Amino acid sequence: MSASPTADLLILGAGPVGLTLAAECRKHGISFRIVDQNPTHSVYSKALAIWSNTIEHLAGLGLAEKFLEAGCPVRRGIFQDNGKKIAEIPITEGLDSPYPQPFVLPQSDTEALLGRHLAAQGVIVERNTRALDVRPQEDHVEVDLQKPGGAETVRTRWLA
């Protein structure tokens, strides 16, 4: 395997957390690489809602409006038993936030929005790339990656 110098941070995984971390790194000038073993972002969702504090965080990245436009606000929860409403709970009461309600937005859409945001800034998610081995060292981490073109050993200060 070829050893290659790399960025300060290697992000393994381009799901919502990895993509958000990449956006934060880009915003703050931290050098990074982001890799994912999948050929594209997921078309399946493991999560359907984005809550107030997440929208507040996305606002700091300049993304809140795009997410709000793509999602559907949830203002109340309705519980039913055999088709009969048994309870209704307002979701927004007591939330001290500029975004007082959660939004329904499939995880696949979340990943697509974050991916487009990063691509517009020139960030490339290295797809079809997976970690084979991780070796912590005294002042860095070595990670063996399997890529479509072969294997690569990456040295990085931090691993996420």
Which residues fall in each region the model found?
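A conserved short coil-to-beta-strand element within the FAD-binding core of flavoproteins
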Residues: 127-142
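Glycine-rich Rossmann-fold phosphate-binding loop(s) that bind the pyrophosphate
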Residues: 14-15, 37, 107
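Beta1/beta-strand and adjacent pyrophosphate-binding region of the FAD-binding site
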Residues: 2-17
